[in-house]
Amino acid sequence: MKPSLKLKKLQETVIQCRKCPRLVAYLQEVSQRKPRRYQDWDYWSNPLPSFGDPNARVLIIGLAPAANGGNRTGRMFTGDRSGEWLFNALYQFGFANQPNSLRRDDDFKLDNCYITATIRCAPPKNKPLPKEIENCRPYFLEELDLLKKVEVIVLLGQIAFTQTLKSLRSKGYDVPPLSFGHGKSYLLSRKLPTPVWNGLKPFHTELQTISLITTYHPSQQNTQTGKLTRPMFHRVFKMIKKKLEVES
C-alpha cells in the first residue's frame, strides 16, 4: 500500500479513537455549550486527523486542537486565531494556496508541508495530561514513518518541542540535551540499519539527518502580548525556506 493511502487509513483510525475518557467527555461538553457566534455550527467534536502533502519536506507540529477552532471545524488550525497566523505565513512563503481557512471544505491546500499535533483532541484549558499525550504518541510515530520525505520539522511551542524530541529519540535519533526558544535550529541524526550481504558487514553506516526549527506558538496568549510578532514568526519561515534550498 502506498504511504499516502496508509496515511489516509491512519487518519480514519485517529478519528475513531476513544482512548481518553476525559477528552471524549470534554469534546461532547464543548459541543453542547457553544459560544453564541457558533450556535449554527455542527461541531466536529472528534479526534482531528492531520493533513497536508504526503510528500512534504516540511512537517509542522502543534500542541492540540482549539475547542472552538479545529474541534469545531474538523481540521487542525482551521477557524481559530492561531490558524490565521500560521496559514497566512504558509501562504506568504509558498506552502499554501490561500492565506486563510475558515472551514475544512474551503479548498485550502498545503504544498510541500504537512500539519499534525501532539494530541488530536482539544483538552480542557488547553492542558493535556501526560497519559493523554502518551495515548496519542503511536499515531505520530506512524506518521513519522510514512512521511518519508520530511527534512525539516517545525515545532510550535514548548510541549511540541519536548514531546517530539522524545518521539525522535524512540526512533533512534541521537538527541542531546536541547533547549527550547524562538527561532532555534538543531540538526539530529540517526544511523540507518544496513543490510548484511553473505555475512559481511558494510564498510560504512548510512546516517539520516533531520532539521528542527522551534518557534513560540502563534496562540493569542503570545501574539496579543507581543511575545510573538509577525516579523518574528516570518523569520522562522525564512529559515525553513533557506534550509530547503540548501538541501535541494
Provide a role label for each language-model segment.
Residues 2-182, 196-202, 210-245:
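A polyanion-binding, active-site-adjacent surface
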Residues 186:
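The conserved 3'-phosphoadenosine-5'-phosphosulfate
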